Amino acid sequence: MSSKRTADQEALVAEARSFARDTLIPLTGSADEGALASAGYRAMWDACAAARYTGLPLSTSAGGRGLSLTDCMRVFESMAAAGADPGFLFSLGVHQFAVAVSVASIGSEDQRAQWLRQMAEGSCIGALAVSEPDAGSDTYAMKTRAEESADGFAISGEKIWISNAPVADLFVVLARTGDAPGMFGISSFLVPSTTKGLTIERGPAKAGLRNAPWGSVRLDRALVPKSNLLGGLGGGGAVFQSSMRWERCGLFAIALGAMRKSFGDCLAHVRHRTQFGKPLVDNDVVARSIALMKTRLEAARLLLYDAAAAIDDGEPDDAAVCLAKAYVGESAVANGLAAQELFGAAGVLEQSSATIFLNDMLPFRVLSGATDVQYKIATRLMLRAHP
């Protein structure tokens, strides 16, 4: 893809950068761990809603901005590079990339009319409920079931590690509706948080992305009308794949932005820190570390934006998405470890910028699909494409 940006895109990036610096960063300090309806989290969310950052990929007719995936990524990368909290941005991204886009692209006319404007305006927060105690990377081994009756679908099961669960108003829940193997026996449902039989539990504290609330959901014959079936019976796999394409590109732009900020911090440090009578950067080992950090950042960025461009062009390459996602996660963690070493003893302090950056990047190796699983999927897809 071309790295050149149009005047409109430059303005979009500048606006996002200013919003992060002037609005989000001053509010971050008051958001507590887990962000369970804390004043800081809600203040950041409401500010994003007022500035129309809660419906970036949704159509203007639905109250959104109508941005492409690539332009959404530019917004999130710019905010993270400016210093906005990656955890909060992750929460904001899940709402849009994992949920709102699926409702917009796969939902029925009635579903879109009911939910999209609320989601674009930020008054309805979305969450995607997929993982289970015995079904993590083995997604389609899920045991949650939806039983059809004249009244609708009664859903029973447990979902865990759900980003946005404590603050969500609407869940997209994947559940088994048949005995067909793999994805073909899975359907997806729109389940409001107020549904009888649905219980939300706050998740345990995380080392990183602390301002991204997460938790679990228990469903005890939670009844939803048949009109809440998203994507048709047996269509849950397609909904999940669509969500993952957007999520793995959109959310990982946050990691790119955080890598950019960390790289800038490291560059300034090695330029001004003096040891043995000369700046750190004059040491060959330090210079090599800085060069490798920049190489990882730029290579990761190219992979991720190329994968997104293919999605925007209507020709998604799932292998490219998996490879990009995996490489961004690995590169972010590698840069985090390098940053700690460059800052020395100060770099391992709990509240040092290097430690916070590394802790925020570690989840990107696991969330939205573990790194090694992504490589396995990508290889399988490439073998299938080149028999």
Regions found by a protein language model. Name each.
Residues 24, 87-110, 136:
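N-terminal glycine-rich flavin-associated loop
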Residues 1-92, 114, 118, 334, ...:
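Amphipathic, small/basic residue-rich leader segments at the start of a protein or domain
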Residues 154-200:
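A short core secondary-structure module
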Residues 25-36, 267, 271-279, 294-327, ...:
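C-terminal helix-coil-helix/basic helical segment that borders enzyme active sites and/or dimer interfaces
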Residues 3-7, 12, 199-298, 364, ...:
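Glycine-rich beta->alpha junctions and the first turn(s) of the following alpha-helix
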Residues 2-5, 74, 242, 343-387:
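Glycine-rich phosphate/cofactor-binding loops in nucleotide/flavin-utilizing enzymes
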Residues 122-130:
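A short, Trp-centered hydrophobic/proline-enriched beta-strand micro-motif
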Residues 144-147:
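A structural signal for short hydrophobic beta-strand segments in well-ordered beta-sheet cores
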